[in-house]
């Protein structure tokens, strides 16, 4: 059975939008928050706290999304989210913004597969018991040829889902998705397609 996930769009799909969407159209199977950016301060911004306030997400399946390249920052946020009742987190390796990629975050981290592998290893070694992690990814930063190596890394870890946008970071949302890259996806986790989904006419 097909499921409908509401992907995040910064500045648009915050908690008020989620509440209104669910009330008017019925709830999506999952809502992903706009990304939270845990860092060395070990604090969330006010707007981030609003996004993850359990009272703002009552009755909805909400998955907080994290954008970072440091396992220790991810794990700090995981502990905070676990304490608020969340049991699934999404690791954002898909946001194509140049300012994100330049910091080796999002798909910027995909250009450094050893760092990505080490980050995932530390995350899964330190997660709170009962917390699961899904990954939202592009198929590479600069070249679709990066995809087989990245896919081999993802296959090493017990992801709850692998969400794939079959474009590289440099393509942003332009051109035709690399359907062959999506067709190559296989692993020990459910795979979810993202990008260029249109209603039939």
Can you say where each PLM-predicted feature lies in the sequence?
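Flavin-dependent oxidoreductase catalytic cores
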Residues: 1-201
């Amino acid at each position: 059975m097909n499921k409908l996930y509401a992907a995040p769009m910064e500045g648009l799909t915050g908690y008020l939008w989620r509440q209104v969407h669910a009330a008017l159209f019925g709830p999506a199977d999952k809502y992903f928050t706009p990304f939270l950016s845990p860092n060395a301060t070990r604090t969330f911004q006010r707007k981030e706290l609003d996004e993850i306030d359990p009272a703002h997400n009552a009755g909805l399946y909400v998955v907080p999304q994290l954008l970072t390249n440091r396992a220790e920052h991810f794990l700090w946020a995981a502990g905070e989210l676990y304490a608020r009742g969340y049991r699934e987190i999404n690791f954002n390796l898909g946001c194509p913004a140049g300012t994100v990629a330049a910091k080796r975050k999002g798909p910027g981290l995909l250009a450094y597969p050893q760092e990505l592998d080490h980050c995932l290893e530390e995350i899964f070694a330190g997660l709170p018991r009962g917390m699961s992690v899904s990954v939202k990814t592009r198929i590479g930063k600069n070249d679709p040829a990066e995809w087989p190596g990245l896919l081999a890394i993802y296959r090493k870890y017990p992801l709850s889902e692998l969400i794939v946008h079959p474009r590289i970071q440099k393509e942003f949302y332009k051109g035709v998705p690399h359907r062959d890259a999506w067709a190559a996806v296989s692993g020990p986790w459910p795979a979810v397609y993202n990008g260029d989904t249109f209603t039939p006419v």
